[in-house]
A protein has these predicted regions:
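Carbohydrate-binding surface patches
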Residues: 373-421
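Solvent-exposed beta-hairpin/edge-strand motifs
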Residues: 416-435
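Noncatalytic carbohydrate-binding groove/subsite architecture in carbohydrate-active enzymes
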Residues: 182-306, 310-314
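Mature N-terminal, pre-catalytic/accessory segment of carbohydrate-active enzymes
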Residues: 12-72, 76-77, 472
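Aromatic/acidic polysaccharide-binding cleft in carbohydrate-active enzymes
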Residues: 276-360, 367-377
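Bacterial N-terminal signal peptides
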Residues: 2-10
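C-terminal beta-strand-rich structural cap/linker in extracellular carbohydrate-active enzymes
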Residues: 437-472
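Substrate-binding cleft and catalytic face of glycoside hydrolase catalytic domains
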Residues: 77-235, 241-244
């Protein structure tokens, strides 16, 4: 029987550490030399109409994390869409028998909280000869028997979640298995997506799910899809592409968008997985670097707002640390977890992401013409946004010259905006969420320009914003 309505869930108290809702919940050493007048107010996911973000809730299919331990932290964060993985091996432990109970408990809980789900079709199943690998980098199913079994599982899963899950994604990071070439990836995407779309005609499907952000790899895969007339199966194409300095990725991102434009005017690129560790790691992306909670928070914000500024949907990887058995604990979570999956600490990045989500929702639109100029001793990124309802404006900017560090020391920047009215500007630090007054003697208005003198700037995003956008 297909369940078409989400269950109603009760919201229990958080079992782990309590979420701090005080104005100084995100504690840093920042001192910009300005008068603090307030703090950003977090917004729950059900208080936000829509936004650019997806939150990773991965690896539950392999029991590396426990949804029940972190579920109460999702809605207060403010992100409305979560990424889950389908788990063929966990669902079909006995050939021909599907037990979706484990996934139902997660999907129904998430739906009951008002969350949207993007469900990924992976990984393999060793019950079948040639059934592929059941973990990251495992190969696709290859034998005739295993491929037929894959098709049956995808169809059963799509039918089971029709009415509950509309958004779907293909097998995660097929390209990190070097046996998988475009000639393998594209046909496997086609067979999977065709089944989903037949069962759920209005499904929204993300193709490829590539680890790489290589324009050449994308082009090689898209050409095969286009040659088969299958581009219309897909609404998005996913890339990941980790970089120590998140800002250096955007030349590739723009090339990815141009590449996709050769084959489709409808589909869009989507960043499907990116995050930063909060401590030194020896395995996984961004390993062997002295990350801390401070640099993680900065990195996550720069990735989120860099993606938004380049008009790309963006994923935060991940809600909670997970114990990747046989490797090590992946510390990219916003929540710090023990080896036995218990949430022990809320990281600084949780509050930083919460601050970002509270400001940047779908009521803002990017002002695309060049309206911001920044004079600084290093390279910077900057973007301008306007509230579609009120017309009120803000600018976000940061130093993008290197990998985020642990320092909260700011240096002065001179910022010029053109044709962007900000009547009562405030300065906001997104890591801490603190809002500061900008002294009148640092603001010069001349014709269509506003000059902000000696704006505190460092390697994490800050705002110059209309006060009434943030403080009611």
């Amino acid at each position: 029987m297909v369940i078409t309505m989400c269950c109603i869930v009760s919201f229990a108290a958080v079992a782990g550490p309590k979420i701090d809702t005080s104005p100084d919940r995100a504690k840093t050493a920042l001192n910009p030399g300005l008068k603090q007048i307030g703090s950003l107010q977090p917004r729950r996911a059900n208080e936000i109409s829509g936004s650019n973000w997806t939150l990773g809730c991965e690896t539950l299919d392999r029991d590396f994390a426990d949804y029940q331990q972190y579920k109460e932290y999702i809605v207060p964060l403010g992100i409305k869409t979560i990424r889950l993985q389908g788990g063929w091996a966990k669902t079909e432990k006995v050939k021909g028998k599907y037990d979706f109970t484990w996934l139902d408990s997660i999907v129904d809980d998430a739906c009951g909280r008002g969350l949207n789900i993007i469900l990924e079709t992976d990984y393999g199943n060793t019950n079948y000869v040639g059934g592929g690998g059941a973990d990251l980098a495992g190969g696709f199913p290859t034998s005739g028997e295993a491929l037929a079994a894959w098709d049956r599982w995808v169809e059963a899963m799509a039918a089971h979640y029709k009415g509950r899950v509309r958004d779907w994604a293909m097998w995660n990071e097929p390209d990190i298995n070097k046996k998988h070439q475009p000639g393998d990836i594209a046909p496997f995407n086609i067979r999977t997506a065709e089944i989903i779309r037949r069962v759920i005609p209005d499904a929204r499907i993300a193709g490829l799910s590539l680890s790489s952000s290589s324009p050449k790899l994308l082009n090689d895969c898209l050409k095969l899809l286009a040659d088969q007339g299958k581009m219309d199966l897909f609404n998005w194409f996913i890339y990941h592409g980790y970089d120590f300095n998140p800002d250096i990725s955007y030349q590739n991102v723009e090339e990815l968008k141009v590449t996709l434009g050769k084959y489709s005017t409808q589909a869009k690129m989507r960043q499907g997985e990116n995050g930063c560790p909060s401590e030194v790691a020896t395995k996984f992306a961004l390993s062997n670097y002295p990350w801390t909670e401070s640099s993680q928070a900065k990195w996550d914000l720069r990735r989120m707002l860099g993606d938004l500024g380049h008009d790309v949907e963006s994923a935060v990887f991940t809600i909670c640390d997970f114990n990747h058995l046989g490797r090590e604990i992946n510390r990219k979570g916003l929540l710090w977890a023990t080896a036995d999956k218990q949430v022990e600490k809320i990281k600084l990045a949780y509050y930083a992401v919460q601050n970002c989500v509270a400001v940047f929702d779908d009521t803002l639109e990017r002002v695309k013409e060049p309206v911001v100029g920044v004079v600084y001793d290093k390279s910077t990124a900057s973007f301008a946004y306007r509230n579609k309802n009120s017309g009120r404006n803000l600018v976000v900017l940061w130093c993008n010259s290197g990998t985020p560090d642990d320092s909260f020391v700011t240096r002065p920047a001179q910022v010029v905006v053109k044709n962007l009215a900000i009547k009562e500007p405030v300065w906001v630090d997104l890591v801490s969420g603190r809002i500061y007054e900008i002294p009148a003697d640092r603001i010069v208005k001349t014709g269509e320009f506003i000059i902000f003198k000696d704006v505190p700037l460092y390697d994490a995003p800050v705002l110059i914003a209309e006060k009434t956008l943030l403080l009611k």
